[in-house]
Amino acid sequence: LGDVYKRQIQAQVLSMMSDLRDKLGTAMIMITHDLGIVAQVCDKVAVMYAGQIIESGTLEDIFTSEEHHPYTKGLFGAIPNLKVDARRLSPIEGLMPDPSNLPSGCHFHDRCPHCMDICREQEPAIYSNGTHCIACHLYDGWDGKKEETT
């Protein structure tokens, strides 16, 4: 019952913030782990890990693209989805690194299911298709278009 009231208050606050943003013609920065809020109020999204932006794009880029940083995939994998027949959620394994002693290379490599040697050694460049940017060695050479296989 308590969660119902929390959601109602949250919806009212978000509505007031959106109205104020529209009335003043200004921008708003929303910092949250709640992807439902992101989907409701954001036009552009930046996903951060260990203090760095590892993926950014339009709301559509982040919520509908098949290409994602492994951390972003993990965030979506930890959300219940009634449209997908999944027996279990797939949360991100491991713990955040110590911010005072970040690992070399990609800061996510210790938790990444796709970790390669280069991930441990070299910080990834930012790969972009114009509106969607991903900082991950998996996307080296990515132009935003899915390669067709024959």
Description of each model-found segment:
Residues 1-5:
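Short, small-residue-biased leader/transition segments that mark boundaries at the very start
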